[in-house]
Amino acid sequence: MSENKVNLLDFDRNALRAFFADELGEKAFRADQIMKWIYHFGCDDFSQMTNVNKALREKLARIAEIRAPEISTEQRSSDGTIKWAMRVGDQEVETVYIPEADRATLCVSSQVGCALECKFCSTGQQGFNRNLTVSEIIGQVWRAAQVVGFPKDTGKRVITNVVMMGMGEPLLNLSNLVPALSLMMEDFGFGLSKRRVTVSTSGVVPALDKLGDMIDVALAISLHAPNDKLRSEIMPINDKYNIQEFLGSVQRYLSKSNANHGRVTVEYVLLDHVNDDMEHARELAELLKDTPSKINLIPFNPFPSNPYGKPSNSRVDRFSKVLMEYGYTVIVRKTRGDDIDAACGQLVGDVIDRTKRTMKKRMQEQEISVKML
């Protein structure tokens, strides 16, 4: 396909309607027709869009395309989890489909690599390359649906939930993230409830404040430590935005949101004998007392060349019980897809050579400091 063609996956509904009116001289409802073909029927061939007049179909074929990332490899876990490496330009990101009895969740990437360097995350140890475009984010959902089924194929919505918990820090790609989220929830898009679309962040405070003014989705926060000293050791972003600043922005977001039922999901990776003592649990409980929360405990998933270990079941149970004694809803996340390196913190993809890492990191730090303010 020609690089000069406009990729319609890069437009949310408002932008697509404007494109049809301003660039094509067409009525806005024609954009809605095309969106239904793309997102409800999984169609990427204009000639097959039979309720669209032939002249418009031919015009679109000349100037536009519907291009999602291609699947490079597919791995299927014994538990039903599917991990895809998807080609974005000359690199790859990873997308994970997690089916359960009552839902099916798609874990989507927002960047090629990640600049935040969280010590327990495989992606963070690989370096940062670039942000994904709107089409590369929403295209992961489109391509996954092509494999597992669009509603017109199955008679039901196969992908019921989307979590922005793949490669990258979503809030460092806000300008492309928000239109993609809109397409996930738009009736002419994938039509998901805002309570079924979750953005996870490690604490980019200015961007979280901005997100709350732009769109309403479920929020999960990557906390992973109950105090600044420990969090800074395992999550360098804490040196820029400490826990109290982070939780302050969370509370501001919750005050604007209807998608979260007034509480945030707190993600806490349990690292053996690092952040999983009973005293850590008590400290965490006190820390969150003013932030309505449900807590997801995630036993660490080891990966090569990482110093951390997975805690024993007894340590996980003790930690969980302390939090429940304080009245918190606690879920111990079941590890899914670890036999194909698709579990939390294991996504790597095909990212940059480490010799480019310093330059990319500096650019990303400038984005944190300047662009989001």
Curated annotation (Swiss-Prot):
Which InterPro entries does the protein's record reference?
Aldolase_TIM, Methyltransferase_A, RlmN_N, RNA_MTrfase_RlmN, rRNA_lsu_MTrfase_RlmN/Cfr, rSAM
Top enzyme class: transferase
Recorded superkingdom: Bacteria
Q: What is its main location?
A: cytoplasm
Does the record bear Flavoprotein in its keywords? Answer: no
Q: Does the keyword Methyltransferase apply?
A: yes
Where in or outside the cell it occurs: the entry states: Cytoplasm
Q: Provide the family line.
A: Belongs to the radical SAM superfamily. RlmN family.
HAMAP family, sorted: RNA_methyltr_RlmN
State the remark under miscellaneous: Reaction proceeds by a ping-pong mechanism involving intermediate methylation of a conserved cysteine residue.
Quote the function comment for this protein: Specifically methylates position 2 of adenine 2503 in 23S rRNA and position 2 of adenine 37 in tRNAs. m2A2503 modification seems to play a crucial role in the proofreading step occurring at the peptidyl transferase center and thus would serve to optimize ribosomal fidelity.
Record's protein name: Dual-specificity RNA methyltransferase RlmN
**Origin organism of this chain?**
Tolumonas auensis (strain DSM 9187 / NBRC 110442 / TA 4)
